[in-house]
Each structure stands twice: as C-alpha cells, then as structure tokens.
Amino acid sequence: MAEEQARHVKNGLECIRALKAEPIGSLAIEEAMAAWSEISDNPGQERATCREEKAGSSGLSKPCLSAIGSTEGGAPRIRGQGPGESDDDAETLGIPPRNLQASSTGLQCHYVYDHSGEAVKGIQDADSIMVQSGLDGDSTLSGGDNESENSDVDIGEPDTEGYAITDRGSAPISMGFRASDVETAEGGEIHELLRLQSRGNNFPKLGKTLNVPPPPDPGRASTSGTPIKKGTDARLASFGTEIASSLTGGATQCARKSPSEPSGPGAPAGNVPECVSNAALIQEWTPESGTTISPRSQNNEEGGDHYDDELFSDVQDIKTALAKIHEDNQKIISKLESLLLLKGEVESIKKQINRQNISISTLEGHLSSIMIAIPGLGKDPNDPTADVEINPDLKPIIGRDSGRALAEVLKKPVASRQLQGMTNGRTSSRGQLLKEFQLKPIGKKMSSAVGFVPDTGPASRSVIRSIIKSSRLEEDRKRYLMTLLDDIKGANDLAKFHQMLMKIIMK
C-alpha cells in the first residue's frame, strides 16, 4: 500500500505541475464536474466514467481528475464514496451557503482497507498521504493527531471570512514532504463535506486535496506473500497476510490404542511401518511436471534418524573445535603470564645493575684519593753518611701533590718542613724516615727476588728438585740428575751443580 500511495502522490504532483503550466478553462471544468456528478449518482459506473473523463480532458495526465481545482471561478464537484449524499447538512460544519462559491480546490479522502478488502473508518495510517493541489502556492496540508501537537499553527485557525476551516492543526508543506507527515481524514467528516460540496456551488477554501485510491482486490491481498505496512505508530499492529500451505511434507501422528478388544479375527500387521519423529518433503511425481524424488528424500526413507545423527555429529564436531580453541587459548594465556614474570625479573636485574654501577662509581672515587709510596733502593750519593737511600718524594699513582704523604713517614713534623722548596711535584726536604719504614740492604750471598743462591739448607735442595721436574728434559736424564743431587754434599758443590743444571736447561 505504501508503494501505491507514493504513486498517487507522484501523479498528483504531476497534475499540479500540468495545471500550473496550462490552466484549465471553465468549460472543461464544468464538463468534468457534470460527469463526476453522474458517477456519484451511479457508483457502479464510476471507474468507466473516470476513464472516459481522463481520456477526454486536454493537457492532463491520468490522475489529474482527482485533483482538479477551479482557477476561473468555476464550481468544482467532488466524488463521493457511494450513494446517500445529503444536501441538507451545510450548517453541520459551520459553513454558510454564501461562502461555498469561494472554493477552488477539491477534497478527496483516503480509506484504510483491511486484508479482506473492507473499508475501515476512523483508523489513522501513518503512510496515508495528503497531496497538495490547486494553483495557490500558499495551500497547506493538515497533519494527523500526533503531528497537530507539534504544529506551529494554532488549532482551528479561522479563515479570512472568520469561520474555522478545520478542527486540526495545519502547517505548510513542501514538495519533498514525507508520507508519515500526512493524516487520514475521519470518515464522518468526509461524508459531511462531500454532501455539502455535491449540493452547493460555493465552498470555503480548505487548502487540501485527498486522493481516493480504488479499493484493494481481496483476492490479491490473500495471495500476496508480502505483508502490508501498517505504519510506524506504536498503537497500530501489523496483522500480516495469510497464505494457504501447499506443502505435503510432514509426519503422520500415531493413533491411540483402542481399549476395547476386537470382536472378529485380527488383521496381520507385520508390514506396518514404524512411527517416525520427522519426515522429509514428498513431492508427487507426474509425467507432465517431470519432478522426481530428491536423493535426500530417498536417503531419509532408509532411516528416520538420519538427519538427527548428522546434526548430532555436526554439533559434536563444533564442540570439539571449540574445546580445541579453548585449549589453545589457555596455552597462549599461560605463555603470556610467563612473559609477564620474565618482564618483572628483567626489571629487577636492571635495578641491580644500576646499584652495582653506583657502587663502582663510589669505589672509583675512593681509589682516586689513595696515594701509594714507592721507596728507592741503594744509598744517596750526596749523603755518604746515610745508611739507606730514601726516595726524595713519594710519587702518587693518581695525580696528587707529592708532599701529601710525607707527614706520616718523616721524623720531622709537617710544620717544620720547608714548603718553599717544593717545585714540579718534588720536595727538597731531607728528613729521615722512621725505623719501621726504612728498607734493609740486600745481601748478595742470600737468596732473594733478584736471584737464587743455593745453600746447605733443605729449602735450596727443594728448589733445585723443582727446577729439574719443571724442565723439558727426558725422564732418564731427570732421574739421573735427581740421583746426583742426593749425593752432593757441601754448599760449594751444590752451587756448582746449580750452575751446571741451568746451563743444561738453557741449551
């Protein structure tokens, strides 16, 4: 119905444009109104007369007769919805007879039909369309009950003559209005207006035209598979359409067991098929149609639970796949948790490294302040009376002044030193070191780090044995030298043996 109403709106707009482009003469309007009056008197010939009038009117398209308005003072007449129009009800709407000649538009109505084709009165349809007609650009369309609440125009606004045109709010409408913004006039009001218009030639300017579509075909409504749109109002319900089922599939229900015992002999029931829970669609085969039973139907005849088993197996496969996905997700989550733990350990390692770097920096700072004294050897040639030679200054490893550690090792106090003689990191102070800091002279006949001097002690013999064992001589020669070492007596013989051994090893 929405598509049909939209088509009516489109045709009405085309009529309006045609009327504006080529106004209709008064003679053509009178002829059309006369034909319309005959249609209203004989409703059975309504459609045939409409076709003749539409074919005879000049410069108009097919739906133009539904929206013809007088532009030259003519008196239009409007089709009624069946016989029974009264000529005595001009005062029911509060419209004087003298104002009936001011009408320049026609009024037509929409009826709402149910699915059986019967007209329903007083039901508002959000998709009913009120089309604009006439040449006047200020003509308006009145909204429905819901939309009159949001209208900017006061309800019951009087016209120029001081009479109320309608009891509903009205608002201007443009060419691109929505179908849901238009109301359906009440059936009683439409009948009253049609009676008044069919009688008098003068009619107040209503400012709207209602298009009356033909009643729907009940047979078409019953066979249509598409539900009819009943609007967007929450108070309305869509009942849809009913379609007779043409399918032959289904399962035959089991018959109840009769409690009474049969009086006669029983019939054999060995070939009776068992009951099934469901059955596939059985298509009747005819030579003309050429249809055959599908292989799936034949397979279903072999076992009633085939589809159930297949569906159960599919469900089991889906459950197995979901369980596998869940297991994989759990593995991924566990790995992510381990990664988070490793991240925490890495952060703790970084903190420990930072602490160690701080400690190393602290140790470097302490080492930079340490002074190491390096004493000299031998006697001072300028002081022959001195027992030992002392280092003229204490040289630090890391750059410091040379006189910093002298106060701790010299006999003289720090205040008695001559500081003016300190130049280029050296001092002229000649004070003696304390006894515990003085070095003893090295004896040439005693073993030291400078060289090994053998004696008659067991330590000297152990050193010579170690020299023989660590040498790269043959094993026989090593055993022979060990035997000679055991036989040597005296310090001189041992010193000669040591010299001979060193010559053999150095070869």
From Swiss-Prot:
UniProt region (Interaction with N0), positions on chain: 1-48
Assigned keywords, A-Z: Calcium, Metal-binding, Phosphoprotein, Viral RNA replication
Polar residues bias (residue ranges): 286-301
Post-translational modification: Phosphorylation on serines by host CK2 is necessary for the formation of viral factories.
Xref: SUPFAM superfamilies: Phosphoprotein XD domain
UniProt binding sites for Ca(2+): 314
Entry-annotated residues carrying Phosphoserine: 86, 151
Stretches for region Multimerization: 304-376
Location of region: Interaction with the nucleocapsid (N-RNA): 459-507
A Pfam family reported for this protein in Swiss-Prot or TrEMBL: Paramyx_P_V_C
Keyword Phosphoprotein (UniProt): yes
Region (X domain (XD)), start-end ranges: 457-507
Biased composition (Low complexity): 134-145, 260-270
Location of region: Interaction with the L polymerase: 361-377, 396-410
GO molecular function: metal ion binding; RNA binding; RNA-directed RNA polymerase activity
Residue segments, region Disordered: 40-100, 134-163, 201-232, 250-273, 285-309
GO terms under biological process: DNA-templated transcription; viral genome replication
Biased composition (Acidic residues): 146-160
Entry's free-text remark on domains: The N-terminus consists of a long intrinsically disordered tail. The central part contains the coiled-coil multimerization domain (MD). Forms a four-stranded coiled coil structure. The C-terminus constitutes the alpha-helical domain (XD) that binds to the nucleocapsid (N-RNA complex).
Known function: Essential cofactor of the RNA polymerase L that plays a central role in the transcription and replication by forming the polymerase complex with RNA polymerase L and recruiting L to the genomic N-RNA template for RNA synthesis. Also plays a central role in the encapsidation of nascent RNA chains by forming the encapsidation complex with the nucleocapsid protein N (N-P complex). Acts as a chaperone for newly synthesized free N protein, so-called N0, allowing encapsidation of nascent RNA chains during replication.
UniProt family annotation: Belongs to the morbillivirus P protein family.
Name of the protein this chain belongs to: Phosphoprotein
Source organism (scientific name): Measles virus (strain Edmonston B)
